[in-house]
Each structure stands twice: as structure tokens, then as C-alpha cells.
Amino acid sequence: MNTKQEAGNEKVTIYDIARQAGVSTTTVHKALHGQKGVSDAKRQEILLLAQNMNYARNTAAQNLARKELRIGVVAEVCNREFGSSIINGIKFALDQLKDSKLTGYFGHLENSLSRPRVLADFRDMLNSDMDAVNLFPTGPYKEYEEFNAIIEGRNIPVITINNEIPHLSCLCSIQQDGVMLGRMAGDLMNLCNPGAANAVFIGSKEVHAQNASALSFEETIAKKGGNLSSIYETQVENQIGFVLTENMLHNYPEVSGIFVGVSQCIGVIDKLKSYEIVDKYKIITVDTYPEVLELLNAGIITATLDRRPYDMGQLAVHLLYQYFNSGIIPPKRILIPPSIITASAAETFNEALYPKISLLTGGIKILPPSDTEQ
């Protein structure tokens, strides 16, 4: 029997698909919405059949008919620049989709949030009537594994942002592309300070993307005869960066290039300023908060790499919307590439005004889990 529907025929429903496939409407619904309880082979068979039958959902009618979709948001670090940009991206996307009955419910967004408070927020979100949860965690991650039973028991989709939690049952993990970040920083350093000694400041080697950026930076500068004297871990604290820069000056006086691969670069630069030697260094940083852009305009920073946290927040919401509205299951891991911001670009930079039309496809790298094992 030819399953292709001719133009002008009555609208195809899930009942038509179920009858054609010889399965229940419940099975069709699960297959179309990416829910558990359907084998991969059967799911693909139903999706192909639906496509051949020109099945199309009435999105407007669905939006009117369905209940409100409640998305919980839990952020462990929301007071700092990178975290606040993620939260702002989430809020922007929720506002875009407010007419689609998509509503965000935020946990505590305080300046100083303890690990027990974050875990309690996450537990409360999972045990409540949330349909999905966006989680922006920081390490250590072991404590999150206890939530697998709740996630799997409720079949609730969880998307982690920026950091992947090993062994946690997640729908998707959206991360910065640490390897590309380090390579781009290395290329910039090779252009402005080739063959020199360098130092790298990151938050922690335990964060996969940050450690990857340091290692790929080292590999890239080596191509032009440069070397990496040391990697410093600031724990994302300016005060620690300030102290570690003193250590660098004492132990590695030959260093003339610095890559700060974490938001908090002010501590490093303030120490160099205190000795009035900041102009002797070529400095590459990350992110685009106001203090960084001011330093960029002043010529203290050579360039900064936007890790696009705002886009990460937006993408997390849009992926959940597509998951519920169209049954599209996102890849397990999505890497967001950085973009280079120079002094000329910094004069007009505003992350909230960046065009978001190509957000879901433009430049985003999707890798199978086997290619990015930690």
C-alpha cells in the first residue's frame, strides 16, 4: 500500500500512523515525542512512516491544548559573569517562547550559593511537577549521581550547561569547545608573540573543557617554537589569580605571553599593573563582560574569546522546546565554538544584540560520545 498522502487529502493523524504501522497510538505518541518504551528500530520505522505520510503537527493547536511546560533552572554559580550570562540567555529564550506555554522556574540565584543549597534545589525541582530541568553545575560532580533514580523514575529530561556530569542520566550536555578555544588562543599568541614562553591560567584542571583548552594551547604555540612554562589553577577567584601571578613572575621571569582561559582575569592583570609591567605582556583572555572589554579597548588585552554562555543558555531552552513540541531528541553532547573579539569589535559588542537566528545550527559542533570520552 502506498503510504504517501496526496495533496488535498485529509490531515494525517497519529491514528492513521498507528493503523498503518500496526501499533497502538500510545506507541506512536512515544515514538514521535522521543519518550521511552519504544525500541530504536521501531521508533525509526514510525518516524519514517510519519514522514512518508506527510504527518505534520498543528503546533498552534497543541500550544492551546496542552498544559504549561514547566522548566526548572538550577545554577550553582550565577553571581559571576559567565554564569549570569547563561541565566540571561535562558531568560531571553523563555521570553521568546512565552506564548508557547513554556515557563521557567528558577532555584536560588544568590551571590553565594552553597553546595547543599544547590543539591537541595535540584532535588526539589526533580521531585516537583517540573517537566524538565536545566542544570548549570560545577565540580565535584559525584554528589549529583544520587539523582539518577529520580530522573529515570520520572523520565524527566535534564540538560546540563557548560559542564558535563559523568554518569548522570541527562538528555543532553551543552559545553564550550575547550579544544577549539585553546587552539584559537594559541593561534592568536603565535601571531602577536611567536616563539615565546607562556603561562596559562584556568579555573581547574578537573573541568574537562578548561584542561583541554590549556593542553591545546600548548600544542598550538609549540608549532611556532613557543613553550608553556606553567598552568595555574585559580579556582575562578581573582584573589588566587593575583597570588599565582606573583608566583609566575618569581619562577618564570622569561614568560611574555599569558592566556587566561577563565572569566576572572582581573587578578592576573592587577598584579602585573602593581609592578607597572602589564604592557610587557601579550594577554589573551576569554569572555566579554564590561571589565574585559574596557581592558581590550585600552590595549592591555590583545584579544578575548567569547565562549558564548548567552547562547548556551538560549540553546538549552530551545532544545527542550523542540523535544516536547516536535519530539526531536538532541545529541548527547553539543560543543559551542568560541568567537574572537578584538578591540575594534569590542566598541560595539553587546551579547544581547547578537543575531540568534542561526543559534541551533550555526557553527555548533555535535560529537558522538565515543569521540569525546573524558
Short names for language-model regions:
Residues 56-121:
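Amphipathic helical "hinge" segments at domain boundaries
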Residues 76-85, 106-117, 139, 174-184, ...:
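Hinge/beta->alpha junction and helix N-cap segments in small-molecule ligand-binding domains
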Residues 130, 196, 252-255, 301:
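Short, high-confidence coil segments that cap the C-terminus of an alpha-helix
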Residues 139-180, 289-301:
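Flexible loop/hinge segments that line or gate small-molecule binding clefts
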